[in-house]
């Protein structure tokens, strides 16, 4: 039947072509007759196309053909000797997930371990000799065609906490992307990174002093992002975020809410461009505002500029690469008797000189937010080895010159390992 239908379709196409390309017949009646024939052929063609679709649907629903050499239905129904009959049992379902359809509803689950060792003295920011710094469990899944969910739990020696947990709506009009839950803010570059993504063992001094340390600006709120059309191959995106108003703790506290109206806000503008086939440049502007621990009438404002340069030659991509990162942050903190204006920055570079080896360095400088006349400086040299994409071993020498003539020399060792399907982090 399929072959017959295809022959009919080809015949109709040939007849239609002949009718169109044939010699013009004089007379209005003959022309009208030809036009009527063309319309009839078109109607028949449409009808045959419908029949072909019906045949295809029936073929898809038909049972699979019996393989050559397989027993026929009559043969399979023939009685067999009792001694040759084996008991056939249904396959046993192991685990509580059931079939593949049920397993598809389970999220991707991963665990990342972060073990750190310290050698050397640091009376300003002391650390234990050995510690399981943080273990992170991630659960990520597509919720429905309109949203996805992400949860990250952190397990440390001080307890368990929700690092991030949010739903992202990705199918909104006008290319808006909305995120609701607890999340790291889009301020700068380092603040949005989890510990295992950092190219160093620690975070820069400016992050610890001005942007809330390891936790950073991480709060419950709403984030709205949109890609802005821009010419000349420039990727431009804008993000606005509204948070409850609590970020950081202790000496690293940035914002603190005293009443429901004491919310904090964050804005970020990002521009990205490929300079050539091997190099790209990523620039960002950031702003954050919230109330500090002194009360509702005292506000802290942060301003930031970040830049990232990436180089990865296509022909030697697995052997050589370079990433340069830098952030500049200004802090305005209202407190008695005077407002404190602090500045901090870091500049770092990481060069891949072998398939699994990376060598990097970082320079740090940061004023203290509550005493801007005190400035801390430092430098680090970092060597990283990646046995595979699921683990990394890193050593870092860190020199810090704290305000008040306190100098420290430390050696930091880190082992990171990953289990399970961990989703990609923002580029």
Regions found by a protein language model. Give the residues of each.
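Bacterial N-terminal signal peptides
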Residues: 5-15
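N-terminal periplasmic/intermembrane-space "pro-region" immediately following the signal or transit peptide
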Residues: 19-121, 414, 424-427
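Outer membrane beta-barrel
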Residues: 91-248, 261-266, 270-280, 343, ...
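Sequence/structural signature of outer-membrane beta-barrel proteins
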Residues: 116-122, 156-158, 187, 243-252, ...
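Outer membrane beta-barrel transmembrane domains
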Residues: 119, 337, 350-352, 356-400, ...
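Outer-membrane beta-barrel "beta-signal"
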Residues: 224, 305-307, 383-385, 407-427
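Detector for outer-membrane/organellar transmembrane beta-barrel domains
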Residues: 278-369, 377
């Amino acid at each position: 039947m399929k072959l017959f239908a295809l022959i009919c379709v080809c015949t109709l196409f040939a007849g239609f072509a002949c009718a169109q390309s044939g010699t013009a017949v004089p007379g209005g009646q003959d022309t009208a007759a030809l036009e009527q024939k063309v319309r009839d052929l078109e109607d028949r063609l449409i009808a045959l196309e419908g029949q072909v679709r019906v045949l295809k649907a029936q073929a898809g629903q038909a049972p699979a053909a019996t393989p050559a050499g397989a027993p026929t239905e009559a043969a399979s129904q023939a009685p067999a000797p009792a001694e040759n009959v084996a008991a056939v049992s249904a396959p046993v379902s192991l685990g509580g997930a059931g079939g593949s359809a049920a397993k598809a509803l389970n999220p991707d689950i991963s665990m990342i371990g972060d073990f750190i060792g310290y050698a050397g003295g640091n009376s300003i920011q002391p650390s234990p000799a050995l510690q399981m710094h943080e273990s992170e469990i991630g659960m990520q899944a597509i919720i429905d065609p309109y949203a996805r969910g992400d949860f990250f739990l952190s397990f440390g020696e001080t307890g368990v906490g929700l690092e991030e947990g949010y739903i992202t709506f990705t199918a909104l009009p006008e290319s808006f992307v909305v995120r609701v839950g607890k999340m790291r803010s889009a301020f700068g570059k380092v603040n949005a990174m989890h510990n295992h993504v950092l190219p160093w063992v620690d975070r820069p001094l400016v992050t610890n002093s001005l942007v809330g340390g390891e936790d950073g600006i991480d709060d419950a709120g709403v984030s709205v992002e949109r890609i802005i059309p821009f010419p000349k191959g420039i990727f431009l995106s804008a993000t606005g975020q509204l948070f409850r108003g609590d970020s950081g703790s202790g000496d690293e506290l940035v914002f603190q809410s005293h009443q429901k109206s004491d919310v904090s806000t964050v804005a970020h503008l990002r521009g990205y461009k490929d300079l050539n086939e091997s190099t790209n440049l990523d620039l960002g502007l950031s702003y954050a505002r919230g109330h500090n621990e002194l009360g509702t009438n005292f506000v802290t404002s942060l301003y930031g500029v970040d830049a990232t340069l990436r180089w990865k030659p296509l022909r030697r991509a697995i052997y050589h690469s370079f990433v340069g990162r830098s952030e500049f942050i200004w802090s305005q903190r209202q407190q008695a008797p005077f407002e404190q204006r602090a500045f901090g920055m870091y500049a770092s570079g990481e060069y891949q000189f072998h398939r699994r080896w990376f060598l990097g360095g970082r320079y740090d400088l940061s004023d203290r937010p509550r005493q801007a006349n005190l400035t801390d400086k430092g430098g680090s040299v970092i060597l990283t080895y990646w046995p595979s994409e699921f683990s990394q071993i890193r050593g870092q020498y860190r020199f810090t010159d704290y305000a008040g003539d306190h100098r420290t020399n430390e050696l930091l060792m880190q082992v990171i390992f990953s289990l399970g399907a961990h989703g990609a982090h923002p580029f």
